[in-house]
Amino acid sequence: MKVFKENKQFTLFSILALIVVGVAVFAPQIAPYDPLDAVMLESLQAPSSAHPFGTDKLGRDLLSRVIFGTRTSLVMTLCLVAVIFVIGTFLGVIAGYFGGIVDGVIMRIADMMISFPGLVLAIAIAGMLGPNLVNAVISIAAVSWTKYARLARSMVLRVKKNLYIEAAVVNGTKTWKILLVHVLPNMVTQMVVTAAADIGTMMLELASLSFLGFGATAPTPEWGLMLNEGRTYMAKAPWLMIYPGIAIVICVVVFNMLGDSIRDVLDPRQE
């Protein structure tokens, strides 16, 4: 409770993030219509009392699709962040602790990945794998783990210098136990803060791939795909792009600000 009282920004954006999560969890109860129900006679209707966000080219209720899009976007984003967190942290810890050729190989691969524009490389990988959300997650993860690996490596190198690590090695403590008991607890906070701050960015990248045709496929209710479908009718039915775009902006801002707030709470030295 003390944290919430002292950090109003953290409190505000925690509440907003919980609202977003609530919308995702209770989408079937909140949405007025089935997001996949097509009624061609009601296609491209402007916002009204029956359809507050209007309808798309197939007569599907846009509000329902935006609500269900929250679930799709949030779930896939959290999966993406979890994947790059685990892979990046694992490789970074291995590189930092063992050093030598292991460190050299992992860091050279990371440097090679960083030398390419991330989104361009992700598009290339997604193009080879084929368009769907799972492949989009794989594509972005393939180019995004490097940040976590470099951060984890630098923290392991710092922790390795402590005398208790040397004492554990001298006492014959197994490597896996040293990593789990002495190394990871000293770096997990910073890694979690980084992951929390990345949620908004990863959500935007997933939406970007879907917008470009390399992510979600029809009829999945996903914000990036909805923007892609709506751009054809931008002059005739601008609401097809306005509402999914607003949803993306709101969620990205909320989770970016929440990530900054978590950084301030867990690591006040960063303020």
Question: Each predicted region: which residue ranges?
Answer:
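Glycine-rich helix-loop "coupling/hinge" segments at transmembrane-helix boundaries
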Residues: 126-128, 140, 155-156, 205-247
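N-terminal signal-anchor/first transmembrane alpha helix
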Residues: 1-33, 109, 187
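Generic hydrophobic transmembrane alpha-helix motif, especially the helices
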Residues: 52, 56, 87, 96-97, ...
